[in-house]
Amino acid sequence: PLKAMYINCKLKRVADTEYRLIAQIIKELGQEIPPTGLPTDEVYNIFYKLLDQQKQLILLVLDEIDQLTKKMGDDILYNLTRINTELKKAQLCLIGISNNLIFVENLDPRVKSSLSEEELIFPPYNALQIQDILKKRSERAFSPNVVQPGVIEKCSAYSARDHGDARRAIDLLR
């Protein structure tokens, strides 16, 4: 069996400390721990036991992973990449998502070697792709005839010209 978990590492009070990140993952696995107060080693022990109880492959997606290392350093990644040595009945697989293509270059060599990284680089969206995304989003978000003709096209063009970032286009549409 496979269980997928998603954590946005840019969110405050979710991934701004190692303790909070592990506590959030524990919460995603169905158990609550106090938001502060326990020694980090004890939080990790709870985490290990809980993972092993799952008896499955856990796919942990860390969005904005570069923000995680920027806030905490790369010790957290080192610990997460070595966790499978502690587990007997489960496995943890990490997927990191980042817009910063060079953040890996600044990691400690021990962390880099344990990542077993495989990079997938997605090119920026073009104006037509962004336009398609915005049309679908606007159909769900707005009542009919609220978005004036040409607005989606203009937002798409601006966003594609800047960086091809769909999030920026959605912000413009708002």
Residue ranges, per PLM feature:
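Short beta-to-alpha linker loops that shape the active-site pocket of alpha/beta-hydrolase fold enzymes
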Residues: 10
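Mid-core helix/loop region of P-loop NTP-binding domains shared across ATPases and GTPases
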Residues: 3, 13-133, 141-173
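Walker A/P-loop
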Residues: 1-7
